[in-house]
């Protein structure tokens, strides 16, 4: 058996995918998030909670406005890391550790214990339990079912989890031989409410979330309303429903009741159109200002029509975002391409682009953004991202030009470029997307690019998902 010790972002799904491939008795324990950070807000002069990552995006905007200088920027950034541990926001680190618990791969309540807390003694209980699991032959394949993955998707909505969860949950399911379709993502996500009042979707941080009841309290609320599969097996040897008995919310300011959520219909929206077959948008981070400015225009509610400003990677964005020749205004959408699994390679967290400084000074803190890469789980903006197929494999994003009009209709779940077919076909003949792909910098990158799938499919390596239960057969002797 194996104890999987996890922490930030990709460490959790990577460890779980390896365990699935080996199919040994496996249990997850993570190092825990940092304690809550505190700092004086430069805008109000009052003390406020400061969350890992999220404060970076907020401080960047304050820097652009001229409210703070670079020294203050660094001070704010450092104040968000007051102790050992991973990010204390509901970024990808905390999200994926919560997902591990939702999948039934941790002992109940272990996902979000702050790193310095004495309750980290849960590691001892985890060690005892793995020995029992070996004796019981409780392998990971007996825990992970399609229903447990649906539980993970639903829990991700309720906690306001990272958009990266779409990639990682899909990848873990692929390794387990389970297909999760685009329609199943929305069916198990969008209709559910946001319950966890944790940054970036909310106000508080993970220390307060843990003290309010953490993941078990959130899942208990979902289970009470028949939104989870309670009979799935977990590493405790008990069903999920048995594990959640008696788990209640202890602070309704931090974890809302199902009937009184922070937001309704808070899950990911799945989009498609003539630019891509698949993309997602995280609705729980749509701010009131963004909603009023872009989604509540009279007669066009839920519809955005905007002029595309196209960037070829983050370097191009940073070089040109302040260029007055681009004439960027609030009727624009910022587009990032070349950021997918093949194009980057590996897919970069660069789609959450902020507007030019002169717009931020006018009070426009975010513009619609779109791209074939990812964003940080700590980001407080709602881009349309994970576009598949990406531009580097000939996806239609490769043929988009600055000045094209993009129409996004959230009601119809569509995203289209308004360019006539004749013009579009001519571009496909004239533009070579291969010329924009940067050379691989290592043999590993070359191998990765040849075998990786798209973000819609979890960005898994095609050859890797062929292998199942590899510990059942010993390798040949080579001496």
Predicted feature residues:
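Catalytic or ion-coupling anion/metal-binding cores of large enzyme and transporter domains
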Residues: 12, 18-23, 31-390, 395-479
